From Swiss-Prot:
It comes from Syntrophomonas wolfei subsp. wolfei (strain DSM 2245B / Goettingen). This is Probable glycine dehydrogenase (decarboxylating) subunit 1. The lineage of its organism: Bacteria, Bacillati, Bacillota, Clostridia, Eubacteriales. GO terms for biological process: glycine decarboxylation via glycine cleavage system; nucleoside metabolic process. It holds the Pfam family GDC-P. It is an enzyme of class 1 (oxidoreductase). The glycine cleavage system is composed of four proteins: P, T, L and H. In this organism, the P 'protein' is a heterodimer of two subunits.
Amino acid sequence: MRYSPHSPTEVEEMLFSIGMKNKAELFADIPDRLKLGRDLELGPGLTEMELNRHLKELAGKNMNLDDYPCFLGAGAYDHYIPAALDQLLLRSEFYTAYTPYQPEISQGILQAIFEYQTMICALTGMDVANASLYDGASALAEACQMACEGSRRRKVILPATLHPEYLEVVKSYAISGKMEIIMAPEQEGIIDKEATLALLDRDSACLVIQQPNFFGCIEEIAGWEKAVHANKSLLIMVVNPISLGLLKSPGEWGADIVVGEGQPLGNPLSFGGPYLGFMACSKKYMRKMPGRLVGQSVDSNEETCYVLTLQAREQHIRREQASSNICSNEALNALAASIYLSLVGRQGLVDIAARCHQLAIYARRQMENYGLSLKYPQAFFNEFAVELDDPARINRLLLEQGIIGGYELPGALLLAFTEKRSRAEIDRLAALIGGECR
């Protein structure tokens, strides 16, 4: 069937209805120098088979993670995604980014979101989780805003070890004037505890700790909760969900709000998005939580049902008085996360986290064999920074050799290791970097 959107008669009728004689008159406001003035020079049409071949040729110009081992992390990670995930995710019942506006006829997706919230709570050790936010950075900004509004304080203490893009997003929220950002210093790759505690005062709404932090280092969490709560401030933790397969949960550390980037949970890198932000908190703060919340209830027949609960917090009801302006969210990505966690299971997540950590330990040894040193003398999960004079040059070299290198820091290269990497790939990485730096 040919695509014929409007017949000449229909075009004439539309022009007549707006008082125009012809199409040239309709576009008279556009300067002639900006008009093409000729027909498009399109080639002959392609068959489906020819078009498929052509698109594959174009796609072949991209760097494919199936062909290029990737050691780039810094917030987004190349984890393996089980084949079953996409088959379930792309079912027509699920294939939307929206949380439903008519929940009584959308029980399937509501239950899926409820299961996602349950898994996030189990993972973080918190009481309540929402149906997702846009990404990890916006989740942190929302958490800081939540802390300020709940405590009626303005100061948000952010560490120098926080992901710089997260910092920029929080700064964009602070433009409103309701939030004042106070930066806490770092010492050897982790938060300077003594200097940071000295920043706490009566107007401090919260302290943020990223674990592992942007540099890959494991922060010393012990003692923070007691000091922060003694000041009647909130402790917000930013976490890598995969790391929770090995590390203590934020709930065990006494965190009040937990946020993070959910991309490692079954979501592809996908040129930077879409991703999802997860958020969980203690029950006492749930009425200040942004975004949708799905709850379990019973219907008039005493059957289990699922509902959007505590909607009075949201902007479609309270407008400018809402806890947040977030509306449509990343429900499809959240569903991917819940399918991923269901497929790998509790022990599977532990195994994935352990393999990531073991490969990072192995990589450190291989780097040290070539005389390379880590920038920071701290424990790490699956990411560390290697000291290099010119990390950009090393990255170019690696790319020429078919390897996607790390994130460039001043005088260092931040490298990430996931369960997809092999020891042979790490050996080659270390040999290329070490050989070039000798």
